Amino acid sequence: MSREITGKMPARKIRKIRKAAGLTQEEFARFLWVTYSTLNRWEAGRAVPFGLPLRILCLLERKLSSRPFQAVLQDPRASDPTFLLYRLLHSTFGRRQPKRL
């Protein structure tokens, strides 16, 4: 069962999530698969995220408070957006066991 993510994410919350992840705007934009100018508009409140970037932001917001994910953020590779996205998705979806037929 999937939960639909809708609504707006305030600019201050996006900035707070980025800073908690320890990423620059450029790194965070690559992490979310958007341009620097798009992220800049979100953080300035001139536009709002939707679709996949919004889903990733919501996942990251939830994971930031967990100890295991805090350890991921301390890893020197965490400034690499690909590494961070992989670890985020793996920590969210990677532990499920496949259903037996």
Predicted features by range, described:
Residues 1-20, 58:
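A short, Lys/Arg-rich alpha-helix, primarily the initiator
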Residues 3, 66-101:
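Short, charged recognition helix plus adjacent turn
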Residues 10-13, 20, 36, 82, ...:
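Coiled-coil-like amphipathic alpha-helices with heptad-repeat character
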Residues 13, 38-41, 56:
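Residue-level recognition of specific faces of alpha-helices
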Residues 22-41:
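Short alpha-helical DNA-recognition segment
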Residues 46-59:
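Short, basic-rich loop-to-helix N-cap that marks the start of a DNA-contacting helix
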